[in-house]
């Protein structure tokens, strides 16, 4: 297939490499001229994925239409706070029924919308799907075994995408519960921030296990009230993603939490992590959702 990637950070780059290894054609767009130059010249994302080679066959571009026009499907991999703005830019070039797979995780603070909801609002002609699960980019790029879930409105779209992403080391399940998948992915970042704070304060493993377990209960309670399914929250995109995010040093949310637990301010922690800490944005949205749906969320 011929694929367009939008966003050339660690996750966008890892997925491009995976899709290229699966014998697809690929063009990646970035908004950042310095990033485009580095990827084109060095064929490596020196800051975010050092040591991972990006094939010469993958086209790197600063022109958004080059990554959209005539592509079989698009992978939207920009950090969640930039989802809507990027979707606006994409809209004029997206064809009727063109598939967009969103791979970021978050909830919009102002509207409380999921990312797929924002994309659909800006690009009504698109067929929007999501990819989520316990999947640190650093490990996917190094071909370590990973399992994820594709959520789509139709089984046909889900199966089409499953076939293209699936590899010997990247296993893909499918689901129709897009809402549950997206809520699990966004809300677990908030719990990971809390787990990091507990680590930073030296609270130990018992406290962390309690946080993770009670955290998934809060996520599931709110998610089911909003229309998600229980099995989604107890699966890869719920408990699976929560475990990896709370336990791994790859997790920027956990790293930021540790720094806050050690006494740094939110701003200092985000500065030190050098990446977008999505849990910070999602925490405010999660609180507002709790109020809206009358759910008690003590950890969040």
Enumerate the language-model features and the residues they cover.
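NAD(P)+-binding Rossmann beta1-loop-alpha1 motif at the extreme N-terminus of oxidoreductases
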Residues: 1-52, 59-62, 89
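Hydrophobic anchor at the start of a short beta-strand
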Residues: 3, 25-26, 126-128, 172
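Electropositive phosphate-/nucleotide-binding environments in soluble metabolic enzymes
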Residues: 9, 13, 33, 61, ...
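Rossmann-like NAD(P)(H) cofactor-binding subdomain of soluble oxidoreductases
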Residues: 54, 60-69, 73-145, 161
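Internal alpha-helical scaffold of NAD(P)-dependent oxidoreductase catalytic cores
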Residues: 82, 93, 118-126, 145-193, ...
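NAD(P)-dependent Rossmann-like dehydrogenase/reductase catalytic/cofactor-binding core
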Residues: 188, 195-199, 224-234, 242-300
């Amino acid at each position: 297939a011929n694929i367009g990637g939008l966003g050339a950070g660690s996750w966008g780059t890892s997925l491009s490499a995976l899709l290229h290894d699966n014998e697809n054609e690929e063009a990646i767009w970035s908004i950042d001229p310095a990033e485009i130059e580095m990827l084109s010249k060095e064929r490596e994302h020196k800051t975010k994925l050092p040591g991972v080679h990006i094939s010469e066959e993958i086209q790197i571009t600063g022109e958004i239409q080059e990554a959209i026009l005539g592509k079989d499907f698009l992978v939207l991999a920009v950090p969640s706070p930039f989802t809507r703005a990027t979707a606006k830019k994409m809209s004029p070039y997206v064809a009727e029924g063109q598939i967009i797979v969103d791979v970021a995780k978050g909830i919009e603070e102002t509207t409380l919308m999921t990312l797929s909801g924002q994309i659909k609002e800006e690009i009504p002609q698109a067929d929007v799907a999501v990819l989520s699960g316990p999947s640190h980019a650093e490990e996917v790029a190094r071909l370590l075994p990973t399992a994820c879930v594709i959520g789509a409105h139709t089984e046909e779209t889900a199966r089409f995408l499953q076939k293209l992403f699936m590899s010997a080391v990247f296993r893909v399940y499918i689901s129709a519960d897009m809402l549950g998948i997206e809520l699990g992915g966004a809300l677990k970042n908030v719990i990971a921030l809390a787990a990091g704070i507990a680590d930073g304060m030296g609270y130990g493993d018992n406290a962390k296990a309690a946080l993770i377990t009670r955290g998934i209960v809060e996520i599931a309670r709110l998610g089911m009230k909003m229309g998600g399914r229980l099995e989604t929250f107890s699966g890869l995109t719920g408990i699976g993603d929560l475990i990896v995010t709370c336990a791994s040093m790859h997790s920027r949310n956990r790293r930021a939490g540790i720094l806050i637990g050690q006494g740094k301010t939110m701003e200092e922690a985000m500065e030190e992590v050098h990446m977008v800490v999505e849990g910070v944005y999602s925490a405010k949205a999660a609180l507002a959702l709790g109020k809206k749906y009358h759910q008690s969320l003590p950890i969040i």
